[in-house]
Amino acid sequence: MSSFFYSTKAAKKKLYPISEALSVQDVLDVLHTHSMLSQVFWPLSITEVLEEKTTVPQSTKFTVSSLNTNNKAALTSQANAVTCTEETFLGLRFTVTYRIIDSRYNPAQIIIHDIFQTESTSSLINSTTLPLETRLYLEEERSLTAPKPLSSLMKMKDGPIVKTRNLLFFLEEMSRNGADMASAIASLKASVTLAGEHGQEKTKED
């Protein structure tokens, strides 16, 4: 998009620990299985595949429909990551990349965000500067591109967006059930449905 008409805002990258029960391949299988990942990102919406490209880089385009919205989205795989781009009718484009980070190849000090050490996944994030253990982390990198008249009204949300919360919940469930994706997605959908019944709202950025 031309920067003359659009403005982009980026959030700080964040790392979230992945259960030691999961391997790099376990997580990659989730990130690169677009049909499953679309259910993780939009568990209560209807997703329809518009176009699927199986050559490198693998990509899938969807329409994502819920009660009041009908957006376009795309998932694109990279070697150790996946990028999700979602566009709304207002011309807003939300982009988030999830990347697997192995702590053995990263600096000794980094900001760690762990939503599973709080009372529940809906609690506020604990953020601490700690030496990295030898384990895997999920890196979240996100940005928002909007037409300049709207960009001044848009703010990047603090904390994990809904897609990130869903993905972390899904991975945690996989770590408990032997990497069974079907059971993990069923648990996620049940959790999201229950949260909706209790009136939890999602923000525009999610």
List where the protein language model places each region.
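Noncatalytic linker/hinge segments flanking ATPase motor cores
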Residues: 55-60, 104-114, 118-128, 170, ...
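Ordered, amphipathic secondary-structure segments that act as subunit-interaction surfaces
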Residues: 78-79, 95
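Beta-strand/loop substructures that line and gate deep hydrophobic ligand-binding cavities in soluble
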Residues: 85-165
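Short, solvent-exposed secondary-structure boundary motifs
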Residues: 37-43, 84-91
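Fungal intrinsically disordered, low-complexity polar regions
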Residues: 1, 111-113, 119-129, 191-206
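Short beta-strand segments that buttress and anchor functional surface loops
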Residues: 61-66, 82-89
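A conserved amphipathic terminal alpha-helix motif
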Residues: 144-205
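Hydrophobic ligand-binding cavity/cleft-lining segments
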Residues: 1-72
